[in-house]
Regions:
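Short, glycine/charged-enriched secondary-structure capping and boundary segments
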Residues: 21-22, 71-72, 96-99
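Short, Lys/Arg-enriched charge-dense amphipathic segments
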Residues: 5, 28, 55-65, 105-114, ...
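Glycine-rich phosphate-binding P-loop
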Residues: 3-26
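Conserved nucleotide-sensing/catalytic segment adjacent to the nucleotide-binding pocket
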Residues: 31-87, 93
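Active-site catalytic pocket residues across diverse enzymes, especially alpha/beta-hydrolases
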Residues: 26, 30, 100
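Phosphate/oxyanion-binding active-site loops and adjacent basic polyanion-contact surfaces
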Residues: 15, 59-63, 67, 119-127
Length: 140
């Protein structure tokens, strides 16, 4: 079954930073990149091919962001795994729920920590969890 790993968290909690770590980890395993879109603030959208499987990654998860159009793009490109950011409630969560039941949704939470060193450690730990879940899903 197709799967979405959705990282939810409040605004400015580090979701983009965490998913950029995930992106870097998965990029090292990618056979090719089908779609790449970066913007100056660090957000990225990619479709990677890993072990013959299309994987969509969207780091923008704020309301009124490109999340909806990215998920449509990922679905059109038959991505079997989608990794994205959302807020904890509201429109971004609904956008992800709209892809069920075609996609199983695996929710992961982003902690909000004020101390930079703890935040970096937490982001890395959450990224590792998501990377390992993706590897398991992709059989790599």
């Amino acid at each position: 079954m197709k799967k979405i790993i959705a990282l939810s968290g409040s605004g400015n909690s580090g979701k983009t930073s965490t998913l950029c770590i995930v992106h870097k980890g998965l990029l090292s395993m990618a056979e090719s990149i089908m779609d790449e879109h970066r913007i100056d603030d660090g957000d990225q959208r990619n479709i990677l091919v890993i072990n013959g499987v299309n994987v969509g990654i969207e780091t923008q998860g704020d309301p009124n962001s490109r999340l909806s159009s990215s998920l449509i793009l990922f679905k059109e490109h038959n991505c079997h795994l989608i990794i994205c950011a959302t807020r904890t409630r509201g429109s971004t969560v609904e956008i992800v729920y709209n892809l069920a039941p075609e996609y199983h949704i695996s929710w992961r939470g982003q902690s909000s920590l004020s101390e930079a060193s703890l935040r970096d450690e937490s982001n890395q730990a959450i990224a590792n969890l998501i990377i390992n879940e993706a590897k398991s899903e992709l059989n790599v």
